[in-house]
Amino acid sequence: MFQPAEPGQEWAMEGPRDALKKERLLDDRHDSGLDSMKDEEYEQMVKELREIRLEPQEAPRGAEPWKQQLTEDGDSFLHLAIIHEEKALTMEVVRQVKGDLAFLNFQNNLQQTPLHLAVITNQPEIAEALLEAGCDPELRDFRGNTPLHLACEQGCLASVGVLTQPRGTQHLHSILQATNYNGHTCLHLASIHGYLGIVELLVSLGADVNAQEPCNGRTALHLAVDLQNPDLVSLLLKCGADVNRVTYQGYSPYQLTWGRPSTRIQQQLGQLTLENLQMLPESEDEESYDTESEFTEDELPYDDCVLGGQRLTL
């Protein structure tokens, strides 16, 4: 008669292979790997776990949302603060972004940096703070003007003083000799607008008083004659302007006085200008045209017309 196996005999009925498989499953479920580690490795792992700390990380520079926002004119938050002359706010922004050159030198749609706008709005103290924070004074706007060009054009002596503060000999020389897209240096602009104090300051700092603008080679002295400004002429002569420097067409400053009302300027320059640079160049001799034919070669009358094989007499 068949009798069921007793509970204690189940393992024997499964066989040795099934028992080994079950044992491996238990090992895989419960073994964390610690038993296979050496004592030294285990101690090192415990030490590293104890040393784990959560440290706050600073957000990367420029990640602040307000730095990325621009108006339709391309103005940043700093541009707007300067335009609206919010000085306290501007100073706080400059303090926060000090050293962030990409933001400080960002140019709007007119290629104006915050430094350009500080000069335009006549805020020399803001301009000074921007320079200390890292603004580049040699960047140009859409007309090729550096901030110093604008200061000279507007006649803001305080801004000129801030922008020409000692920051290295090479830097100062570069900014003084820079020309805008019309070819004018800062000295040219100061001369054109008649700001004598700025002219004197620029020359004392090393500006080339005889620099020629590229359009026709006029120097500041030529410009002073064109503008009929005798006080500027006197100052430029005092600063060492060359009265015998000629334009690309060969005109000296004295020759530009002919036909102009200021006899004072003519007297000032006449005493110093070479004799051959005082008279206007002679015009072409009109009599030379009398000996020339009335017609050019292409306009001479025909004398060899032929019709039907017969020469025509004209």
UniProtKB/Swiss-Prot annotation:
Q: Which residues carry this modification: Phosphothreonine?
A: 291, 296
In the record for this protein, the ANK repeats are positioned at 110-139, 143-172, 182-211, 216-245
**Which GO biological-process labels does this protein carry?**
B cell receptor signaling pathway; canonical NF-kappaB signal transduction; interleukin-1-mediated signaling pathway; lipopolysaccharide-mediated signaling pathway; negative regulation of canonical NF-kappaB signal transduction; negative regulation of cholesterol transport; negative regulation of cytokine production involved in inflammatory response; negative regulation of lipid storage
What is the predominant subcellular site recorded for this chain? cytoplasm
Give residue numbers for the modification (Phosphotyrosine): 42
Q: Where is the motif Nuclear import signal annotated in this sequence?
A: 110-120
Q: Name one Pfam family in it.
A: Ank_2
Family statement: Belongs to the NF-kappa-B inhibitor family.
| Function comment | Inhibits the activity of dimeric NF-kappa-B/REL complexes by trapping REL (RELA/p65 and NFKB1/p50) dimers in the cytoplasm by masking their nuclear localization signals. On cellular stimulation by immune and pro-inflammatory responses, becomes phosphorylated promoting ubiquitination and degradation, enabling the dimeric RELA to translocate to the nucleus and activate transcription.
Assembly and partners are described as: Interacts with RELA; the interaction requires the nuclear import signal. Part of a 70-90 kDa complex at least consisting of CHUK, IKBKB, NFKBIA, RELA, ELP1 and MAP3K14. Interacts with NKIRAS1 and NKIRAS2. Interacts with RWDD3; the interaction enhances sumoylation. Interacts with PRMT2. Interacts with PRKACA in platelets; this interaction is disrupted by thrombin and collagen. Interacts with MEFV. Interacts with DDRGK1; positively regulates NFKBIA phosphorylation and degradation.
Protein name (record)? NF-kappa-B inhibitor alpha
**Organism, as annotated:** Sus scrofa (Pig)
Source lineage: Eukaryota, Metazoa, Chordata, Craniata, Vertebrata
